[in-house]
Structure formats: C-alpha cells, structure tokens
Amino acid sequence: MNTLPATISQAAKPCLSPVAVWQMLLTRLLEQHYGLTLNDTPFSDETVIKEHIDAGITLADAVNFLVEKYELVRIDHRGFSWQQQSPYISVVDILRARRSTGLLKTNVK
C-alpha cells in the first residue's frame, strides 16, 4: 500500500491578525466609499484598531461612527434616486471588500 503525505494548502498561508484584517478592510472601504486613506482617520494607529476589537465593536459600527461624527458622504453613490441614499456602510459593503481584498474566498464559477 502506498501512502502519500498529507498536504494542506492553508497550512502554508500565514494567518492574518485581526488588526491586519481590519487595516485591509478599512483601507478598502474608506478609499472606495469615502475617498479617504487610513491615515485620514484615527485608525492609522494600530492601537485604536485593537481597542475597538477588544471592546467588541464591529467594523461596520466603527466606520459608521466616523461617518456620523464627520458627516461623511459616500462618493460611490451616483445619480438621482427617489430615495435618499444612506451614507453608512452595510454588511454587503463589507462582504464585497472582503472579496476584493482576497479575504473571502468564493467557489462560485
């Protein structure tokens, strides 16, 4: 009987820290939806991100707090709508950011 070594492709990939994941997602969300960089916000400091994570604050709540505090306007909403468009980040926005940064793998073909 021949035996083959077990290979696990994920074992070779380093696991990102929660702070690194937040940095990637914040960078994408802020740039795409508000035209900001991470350095334009308090989240340029890793300690601030860690404090939010430790306090159990979600990424969406953290971004939406900035939106409310600084009255940010989304730059990705174009055109006229009969409904007022929300300036806030949604779960769908975060999922799209996860996919575009490679943090969410989909097997849909």
From Swiss-Prot:
Keywords: Toxin-antitoxin system. Induction: Expressed in mid-log phase at lower levels than toxin relE. The keyword Transmembrane helix does not apply. InterPro entries: CbtA_toxin (IPR009610). Disruption phenotype: Single deletion leads to an approximately 100-fold reduction in resistance to oxidative stress, deletion of 3 type IV toxin genes (cbtA, ykfI, ypfJ) leads to a slight reduction in resistance to oxidative stress, has no effect on cell growth. Pfam families: CbtA_toxin (PF06755). Coiled coil: none annotated. Encoded in prophage CP4-57. Interacts with FtsZ but not MreB. Another group finds interaction with FtsZ and MreB. Toxic component of a type IV toxin-antitoxin (TA) system. Acts as a dual toxin inhibitor that blocks cell division and cell elongation in genetically separable interactions with FtsZ and MreB. Overexpression results in inhibition of growth in liquid cultures. Overexpression leads to formation of lemon-shaped cells; inactivated by overexpression of cognate antitoxin YfjZ but not when the 2 genes are coexpressed from the same plasmid. Also neutralized by overexpression of non-cognate antitoxins YafW and CbeA. Belongs to the CbtA/YkfI/YpjF toxin family. This is Toxin YpjF. It comes from Escherichia coli (strain K12). The lineage of its organism: Bacteria, Pseudomonadati, Pseudomonadota, Gammaproteobacteria, Enterobacterales.
